[in-house]
Structures are given as structure tokens and as C-alpha cells.
Regions:
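Glycine-rich nucleotide phosphate-binding loop and flanking beta-alpha elements
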Residues: 64-66, 156, 181
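Single conserved hydrophobic/aromatic residue that forms the stacking wall/gate
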Residues: 174-182
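A short aromatic-anchored loop/beta-hairpin motif
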Residues: 2-110, 114
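A charged nuclease-like catalytic/ligand-binding cleft shared by nucleic-acid processing domains
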Residues: 96-113, 117-130, 145-148
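Short, well-ordered beta-to-alpha junction loops that form the rim of enzyme active sites
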Residues: 61-64, 123, 176
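Glycine-rich phosphate- or other oxyanion-binding loops that anchor nucleotides, phosphorylated ligands
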Residues: 121-172
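Helix N-cap and loop-to-helix transition residues
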Residues: 100-101, 160, 180
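Secondary-structure boundary elements
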Residues: 47-56, 109-118, 141-144, 157-159, ...
Length: 182
């Protein structure tokens, strides 16, 4: 197994609006700018990494929600049109991304050895989520580095709306009772 090191990490905001505002050729809608603060942040990030050697970009996307295990993209290439379900008039992005399947498999296998439920996504028609695409584009608009894309497993924290409402009510009632005693 090849060994490497993590050379950088970041928490990357990824609303599709920032891709829209940049007007890349891959995105069908055209904007007149906007979202400068976030776009400038990504520009600074890219500048800070321009002399750093790295082989892949690892993205854990909160918008690729899985409920049975954590999934990893498991094919060398994914390409399609991604249309944001909430902002279809802002984000219609033609993506063509390469995946570091070897690294994804190594991470998958380590997670499996640790007892996590994991799966490799090998459906060639799988539509990659906009959070991954936005982060990939803003981080490296040339798309010349492969990605390792990891889903956000929601099974340990998924509640129905009714359960969440009940939890909020119980928490609020408990807080009010505590405040009354103080």
C-alpha cells in the first residue's frame, strides 16, 4: 500500500451560486458576478497551494447523503450534467471528473476494517452531487487532479420531522425549567 501524507485541509463552503457567479464554460446559465467573498477565498486557497505537490483532492460532501453506510466514488471517471434541484436556473454544470480509485479503495478498506459499513459506488450513471462539483470546480477549476469523494452517512443522526420537533420541544421545556430554578 502506498503511503502519503495530508498536505492541506479546509472546510469548503460550496453553494452552487459561486460557480454560477464565475461563469465557467461548463455551467449553462450566465451571471453578472456576485459571491465575491467566497470566490476570493477559493482564489487565496488555490494560490496557497500552487507550489504544493499533491496527488488527489479528498471531498466529504454533505450533499451526497447516504443512509446505509458511507459510500465512495469507485470508477475512474464520472461525467454528466448536474442540475441543482433547488437552483436549476443557476447551476446546470457539465462535469467530467477523474477519481483516484486506488486511494478511495484504500480509505474504504480501512473504514471497513474499523467496522464501518462502506460501499464503492460503481454505477457509471450516478449523478455526482452539486456540493462535490462546486468544491471540485472552485478548488481546482482545471479539473487536473483526481478526487476521492466520500458520502455523508446520515444513518446515525437521521430523525423524522416529528421526532426532531419532539426533541426540540423536550429540550426547550427542559431549558425553561432550568432557567426557572436559577
Amino acid at each position: 500500500m502506498a503511503k502519503g501524507e495530508i498536505v492541506a485541509g479546509c472546510l469548503a463552503p460550496h453553494p452552487p451560486h459561486i460557480v454560477y457567479a464565475e461563469n465557467p464554460s461548463q455551467n449553462e446559465p450566465v451571471a453578472e458576478g456576485g459571491w465575491e467573498q467566497l470566490r476570493w477565498g477559493y482564489e487565496r486557497l488555490r494560490e496557497s497551494l500552487k507550489d504544493v505537490e499533491y496527488d488527489a483532492i479528498v471531498v466529504l460532501s454533505p450533499h451526497w447523503q447516504t443512509y446505509i453506510g458511507t459510500h465512495f466514488l469507485g470508477l475512474e471517471n464520472f461525467q454528466s450534467l448536474s442540475v441543482d434541484p433547488i437552483f436549476p436556473n443557476l447551476f446546470r454544470y457539465h462535469y467530467d471528473m477523474n477519481v483516484d480509485v486506488e486511494l478511495a479503495t484504500q480509505i474504504h478498506d480501512k473504514a471497513h476494517e474499523a467496522g464501518l459499513a462502506v460501499k464503492m459506488m460503481t454505477n457509471p450513471d450516478f449523478r455526482v452531487d452539486y456540493g462535490t462539483i462546486t468544491t471540485g470546480h472552485m478548488f481546482r477549476p482545471e479539473w487536473d487532479k483526481p478526487l476521492v469523494v466520500i458520502s455523508s452517512n446520515r444513518s446515525r443522526a437521521y430523525y423524522s420531522v416529528e421526532v426532531m420537533q419532539e426533541m426540540m420541544t423536550v429540550s426547550y421545556t427542559h431549558l425553561r425549567a432550568h432557567e426557572t430554578r436559577i
